[in-house]
UniProtKB/Swiss-Prot annotation:
Record function comment: Component of the MICOS complex, a large protein complex of the mitochondrial inner membrane that plays crucial roles in the maintenance of crista junctions, inner membrane architecture, and formation of contact sites to the outer membrane.
Gene behind the chain: mic19
Membrane topology qualifier: Peripheral membrane protein
UniProt KW keywords: Membrane, Mitochondrion, Mitochondrion inner membrane
GO cellular component, one term: mitochondrial crista junction
Domain of life: Eukaryota
Protein name: MICOS complex subunit mic19
Family stated for the protein in its record: Belongs to the MICOS complex subunit Mic19 family.
Species name: Schizosaccharomyces pombe (strain 972 / ATCC 24843)
Amino acid sequence: MGNQQSQPEFVLRAPTEFSEKFVRHLQESTETDTSRYMDMENYIQKRVQDELKQLQLRQKKAIDAIQEEEWKSNAKTIKDSQGSLDSNLLSAEFRSFQEKLEKQSSINDKELKIKLKEVESIRSDLLKCMSEHPDKSLICHPLAEKFAILASKLHNPKVGSV
């Protein structure tokens, strides 16, 4: 009674051979760590450039919308006053409108520069980590997650505010 085990011993039965197609693929693959690194670098640079273009386009649309609102409000003011505005008043309003636009534009530029510096910093840290630990990419996973979050915040500013 005490000589036998109550349950049979577990034996893992898994194939230890790989398909010929898979082995051939590994042998014929020309991809190296350096080429993967360069591809990743190019992808990151393209993504940052795309984000910059999208942000500039979004900023231009916002400025156009503000200008349109100002033109509409000015047109309404002109209709209400029935031509009582003189050139001095119009030039003063125009200057105030320009100042508002410049202020808004400078605020957006400053915020964008800060975000881009932060993304660039994380990107360089990630690349440094990946080059220091080419075979241990899990060590760099927290940096990769942080980079992905920052890049998505650049792409969609509402992501971080939820």
